[in-house]
């Protein structure tokens, strides 16, 4: 039962998305608060709901991929009607929690996430690998959820840069994962960037990866970071990532882990810096 629920809701992904919300909250507030838990819980449930609706939309596609064929909807263990009810059961409390944490703005952003992820990205994914350009927008919004729940300004340059970092990170993350799982994607008939653009794929991948690393290097320029040691560490992460790009991107598995570790490392550095600045860590 728990395994089926985990597969349906994709708890691991939802947990990482909720942590991104916590990250945005801590950057804005500098300390934990009740709205941090409320917004993270709402973001977690919203991600679960999107996952359920996605699996309803892609049940035939999931059934053709070894990685996803045993999901409850794709395998037929959970009827579509029941899955839709489960998705709504996750969505409604998500909207209530997010409204409590950040008001109407978070509810509207939640609607944007659903519209872009389930309404645009999921249908487009069958036809073009560049659907990710739309799908990366909702993927970059969780830190914004936390930022707004903490009372941060939606139009501040800091959260705009953070959104850009998350957006740029997702393209190499998902393209490298697709290349890692190449045979499964081809078996399901999903378009791959390396197949759609065989002569330009590697150049585009390097461009997106380099753009992400440059965005990391811009973080110390903005008032995100107070501690000199943290500024240096973030700069070193970006410079190292750029210098080692040829080696890292030569292997989809190696590149996939590199972009993920770099994002996690920088997130942790920024949180530690903010907690030190707030006096919570001395």
Swiss-Prot record:
Name of a matching Pfam family: UbiA
Molecular function (Gene Ontology), one example: protoheme IX farnesyltransferase activity
Pathway: Porphyrin-containing compound metabolism; heme O biosynthesis; heme O from protoheme: step 1/1
Major site of localization recorded for this protein: membrane
Keyword ATP-binding applies: no
Membrane topology designation: Multi-pass membrane protein
Enzyme class per UniProt: transferase
Family of the protein in this entry: Belongs to the UbiA prenyltransferase family. Protoheme IX farnesyltransferase subfamily.
Miscellaneous comment in the UniProt entry for this protein: Carbon 2 of the heme B porphyrin ring is defined according to the Fischer nomenclature.
Name recorded for this polypeptide: Protoheme IX farnesyltransferase
Organism per entry: Oleidesulfovibrio alaskensis (strain ATCC BAA-1058 / DSM 17464 / G20) (Desulfovibrio alaskensis)
Gene name in the database record: ctaB
